[in-house]
From Swiss-Prot:
Pathway listed: Cofactor biosynthesis; adenosylcobalamin biosynthesis
UniProt name for this protein: Cobalamin biosynthesis protein CobD
Any GO BP annotation: cobalamin biosynthetic process
Organism: Pelobacter propionicus (strain DSM 2379 / NBRC 103807 / OttBd1)
Disulfide bonds: none
InterPro entries: Cobalamin_biosynth_CobD/CbiB (IPR004485)
Membrane topology: Multi-pass membrane protein
A GO cellular component entry from the record: plasma membrane
HAMAP family recorded: CobD_CbiB
Length: 323
């Protein structure tokens, strides 16, 4: 169960797509977040060099998450093979966020459809890092589509990639890196030095998945009534139009497929950040564009599921042959 296993991966996908992250079930990311907070406080007290402290924070968090996952899967499998299978599948499913991404983004979309911009701003603030208090309706739709596009990589394709290659241990290690980046990977006075290692590692572990996401979006676009030609054209043209080395890849493919323009100026913590535009404004950014983005997210997920299951089956076969 610790090795890549297509059965575990298939069950994890079904659990995520059907249930998402039930609010009553303790989530590993919450526990990882608490560990990060504890380690950050400890390292700041014990170490003067924040860059070295940042490396230790990364190493300790990822090692802890991977080790606990390994022990849980190994221990449950020792009790019974079925228990090992279910624990591995459950832990793997917590690395995926397709259903949660749709659910949380849909709350914003529903508020906008109801004409409640104030509520939409508040709900959007829960899932994006930018300031939302002064956003107008189109800016809210833009931010919403951008976060769904970017999180298609972070929350779905990248976890599937690592689960297929390394099973639940690799999947949880990736989740630890992603959580670190979301908590300490900021270029501000507090985290510029402490968070640099986590931010760079997040760039690294998402490097291939981000480009794979863009490729899959281009491939599946015509299957759901979107433009493949424009998706490919904009992805090639605008894939580097972002401070992050990865974010613009899925955003550019999505913008091209939908025929919309993303990017541009945004405010973070009261500071204006002027980003390059991604895509061309061939159509308005509205609820229809958002729903197209959700279709694109799910189509991309299904395409990656096929690739991941095939990869896990191949690696499983190689492992069994070597025994």
């Amino acid at each position: 169960m610790i090795q890549p296993d297509p059965t575990v991966l298939a069950l994890a996908l079904l659990l995520d797509l059907c249930l998402g992250d039930p609010r009553w079930l303790p989530h590993p990311v919450v526990m990882i977040g608490r560990l990060i907070t504890f380690l950050e406080t400890l390292l700041r007290r014990c170490m003067a060099n924040e860059r070295i402290a940042g490396v230790l924070l990364l190493a300790l968090t990822v090692t802890s998450a991977a080790s606990v996952t390994w022990l849980m899967v190994w221990g449950s499998a020792r009790l019974h093979a079925l228990a090992g299978l279910m624990v591995a599948a459950l832990l793997s499913s917590t690395c995926l966020a397709a259903r949660s991404l749709q659910r949380e983004s849909c709350l914003v979309a529903d508020a906008l459809d109801a004409g409640d911009i104030a509520s939409a701003r508040v709900k959007l603030s829960y899932i994006v890092g930018r300031d939302t208090v002064d956003l107008d309706e189109e800016e809210i739709w833009r931010a919403l589509i951008e976060t769904v596009a970017e999180n298609t990589t972070d929350g779905i394709i990248a976890p599937l990639f690592w689960l297929a290659l390394g099973g639940p241990v690799a999947g949880m290690a990736f989740k630890a890196v992603s959580t670190l980046d979301s908590m300490v990977g900021y270029k501000n006075e507090r985290y510029l030095r402490l968070g640099w290692a986590s931010a760079r590692m997040d760039d690294l572990v998402n490097y291939i998945p981000a480009r794979l996401t863009a490729l899959l979006m281009v491939m599946v676009a015509p299957l759901i009534g979107l433009s493949q030609a424009n998706a490919a054209s904009i992805a090639l043209r605008d894939r580097l139009n972002h401070p992050s080395p990865n974010s613009a890849h899925p955003e550019s493919a999505a913008a091209g497929a939908l025929g919309i323009r993303l990017g541009g100026p945004s405010t973070y913590g009261g500071l204006l950040s002027v980003k390059q535009f991604i895509g061309d404004p061939l159509r308005s950014i509205d609820g229809q564009a958002y729903r197209g983005m959700i279709r694109l997210m799910y189509a991309t997920t299904l395409a990656m599921a096929v690739i991941s299951l095939a990869t896990a089956a191949l690696l499983r076969g190689i492992h069994v042959t070597q025994l």
